[in-house]
């Protein structure tokens, strides 16, 4: 007798291998995201364990290009609870991001424009690798935020009205 859940288990395995670990929802409210880029991130072992446990906060994070390298600043990854103090990592250390040289050069050219910044949008698993999605964003003014919120509300009401009929 054959097992009946082969496809479900494979789909569940793929979903588990590509799951979202941390999300910066505030960034999409504060910035207009013009372009996104997926990069690798250089981590130590206790950081990987903490991120997989959901102990990462991207809210105050930003990225800079220094000495030709992409660097992630001000992202808090909590110390691993089951590691001793000696072997644990610094929660706010500067982390190196892994991207191709041409991608970094392209970003440097775009960042030279006034008002653009690199913001971490989310951390996710891609197979066994932890990836960081960066967004090239332009800061929104207060009236832009209000207009975006109003547009979002109108679209929501329109969808609800159309679904009733």
Swiss-Prot record:
Main location: cytoplasm
UniProt subcellular location: Cytoplasm
Top-level taxonomic group: Bacteria
Gene Ontology molecular functions: RNA binding
Keywords: Cytoplasm, RNA-binding
InterPro entries assigned to the protein according to its UniProt record, in alphabetical order: SmpB, SsrA-bd_prot, SsrA-bd_prot_CS
GO cellular component: cytosol
GO annotation (BP), single: trans-translation
Family to which the UniProt record says this protein belongs: Belongs to the SmpB family.
Record's function text: Required for rescue of stalled ribosomes mediated by trans-translation. Binds to transfer-messenger RNA (tmRNA), required for stable association of tmRNA with ribosomes. tmRNA and SmpB together mimic tRNA shape, replacing the anticodon stem-loop with SmpB. tmRNA is encoded by the ssrA gene; the 2 termini fold to resemble tRNA(Ala) and it encodes a 'tag peptide', a short internal open reading frame. During trans-translation Ala-aminoacylated tmRNA acts like a tRNA, entering the A-site of stalled ribosomes, displacing the stalled mRNA.
Protein name, UniProt field: SsrA-binding protein
Organism of this sequence: Synechococcus sp. (strain WH7803)
């Amino acid at each position: 007798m054959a097992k009946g859940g082969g496809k479900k288990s494979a789909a569940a395995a793929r979903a588990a291998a590509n799951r979202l670990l941390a999300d910066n929802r505030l960034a999409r409210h504060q910035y207009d995201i013009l372009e996104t880029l997926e990069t690798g991130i250089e981590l130590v072992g206790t950081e990987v364990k903490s991120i997989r446990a959901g102990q990462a906060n991207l809210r105050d994070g930003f990225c800079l290009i220094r000495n030709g390298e992409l660097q992630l600043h001000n992202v808090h990854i909590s110390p691993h609870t089951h590691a001793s103090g000696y072997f644990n990592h610094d929660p706010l250390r500067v982390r190196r991001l892994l991207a191709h040289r041409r991608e970094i050069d392209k970003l440097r050219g775009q960042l030279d424009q006034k008002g653009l910044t690199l913001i971490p949008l989310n951390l996710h698993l891609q197979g066994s690798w932890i990836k960081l999605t960066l967004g090239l964003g332009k800061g929104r003014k207060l009236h832009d935020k209000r207009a975006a919120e109003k547009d979002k509300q109108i679209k929501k009401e329109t969808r609800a009205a159309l679904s009733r009929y």
